[in-house]
Amino acid sequence: MEHVPNEHGRFGDFGGKFVPETLMLPLEEIETELDKALADESFRQEYIRILQHYSGRPTPLTFAPNLTRQLGGAKIYLKREDLNHTGAHKINNAIGQALLAKRMGKKKLIAETGAGQHGVAAATVAAHFGMECIVFMGEEDMKRQELNVFRMKLLGAEVVPVLSGNRTLKDATNEAIRYWVAHCDDHFYMIGSVVGPHPYPKMVREFQRVIGDEAKEQFLAGEGTLPDVIVACVGGGSNAIGMFYPFLQDDVRLVGVEAAGKGIDTPHHAATIAKGTKGVIHGAMTYLLQDEYGQIIEPYSISAGLDYPGVGPEHAYLASIGRVRYESVTDEEAVAAFQLLAQTEGIIPAIESAHAVAKAVELARQMTPDETVLICLSGRGDKDVQMMMHHLGVKEGEDVASAR
């Protein structure tokens, strides 16, 4: 595999910088400072120190014995990003970008958020580093994730409701970029996934690869070999790239799981790689959901963190060369997996992560007991419990099983 991205920020045909002239200079400044920071051992050590002492890394690699036994197939392991401070993988990237922002002398952070986890992570690091934070969030997502909205405000962030479009992640990103264009002198735009113009996909990957680096070391120590299959959910795709990147050169099957919503043959899904075509969104060439006139088709998923109409350009590249297989899981399959993991292992996953669990369960059933499946459990499900109650029709005091 060629080294990507190249000097133009391209992953094969994908990536690049499709932005207005006003953003070229800020992006070049970030790229220059990022490269310097990544080459600076003291920056790397400070990043690792904060991950360990503030976020609680390394996160454990957990064997799932009950789920494994129930399925009767491959051994299932979970990389526990749900045990990070703030409850998801998003904090890895937020710490890295906040450190870079401070190094560049920026005083204020801008973030967009879908499920709210990146917004919470941005607000958290802003509080930790003594910076201001403004978070753009679609009004629809704010309704779905009221708890995270309150968390962000509690942490001192200003949360701006976005009323345009579908009022979800795409629209929040549009507004965040508009705001950044007008305030790039003293603000740092902290993108939450491996999307956007170069150098963001590379930067977020570099701050998320700690997931895969740790998992590789832990798996080798525990099993004496690498996993046969690794599964991760894909919206923008930062947890998946973070997990996959250190394994790209190894003989390991990599499976990304998109949101099939109500079915990929309906208009209600967010399966960008399965159903999308090449186009530019938020400054990068990638696959996206668009009509014949190039207008964005609004995505849908039960998961606020997966209903993005594009995908990280590195994922588009990995799909195009066949290195990673991308599949999709419906709302109902994800809901079933959400309940299954809770009831077999006592671990409530984020609804995003439940998409990966659903696909891993399907794959593990077809495998032998001497094979292994590693799931990136990207976040915990506390934020989704209220939504799940409504979805399952559970009334207070009622048994979950009887509500179905």
From Swiss-Prot:
Species the sequence originates in: Geobacillus thermodenitrificans (strain NG80-2)
Cofactors (names): pyridoxal 5'-phosphate
Name of the protein in its database record: Tryptophan synthase beta chain
Domain of life the protein comes from: Bacteria
Residue numbers carrying N6-(pyridoxal phosphate)lysine: 90
Membrane-spanning ranges: none
Catalytic function, reaction form: (1S,2R)-1-C-(indol-3-yl)glycerol 3-phosphate + L-serine = D-glyceraldehyde 3-phosphate + L-tryptophan + H2O
Enzyme type, top EC level: lyase
Pathway(s) where this gene product acts: Amino-acid biosynthesis; L-tryptophan biosynthesis; L-tryptophan from chorismate: step 5/5
Gene responsible for this protein: trpB
Recorded GO MF terms: tryptophan synthase activity
